[in-house]
Amino acid sequence: LLEEGLKAIFPEQKIGLSAEISKQRNKIAVKLITKVVGDDGIEVEAEGIDAFGGALTTIKSLLLRVSLIMRSELRPLLILDESFPAVDSSRVHLLVDFLKVLCKKLDMDILCITHDPAIAEGADLGYKIRPTTQGAKFDLISNPRK
């Protein structure tokens, strides 16, 4: 799942990611190893969620959350609250496509909170929330793609 996600969003780059998930003292521990092969063919390896920074860190965080919720006994629900600020606008459509594939393959739902119209347009169902004097008003967007 981790490598498939990275390849879907960064198809032109050679990126590998492995995760060792274990339980230590009643807490989940994750060791992430990221490998990137540069244009010169040199492989660089780093440990940690923030290895190589920016959009790569954002996507690794998403994939890690998905991996963890798939271990749950409940129907998986992934909540994403403005989770992709570092993802370049040229990659947002790839990200949305990948999220749809995840939902189908893993039989899960995603609740995505965003101000990014490109992400909102990819939704199957959308709501616009606006403040009123009586509190928040939820307006159903029947077809977010329009």
PLM features: what roles do these ranges have?
Residues 2, 55-58, 62, 91, ...:
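Helical mechanochemical/support elements of P-loop NTPase systems and associated helical scaffolds
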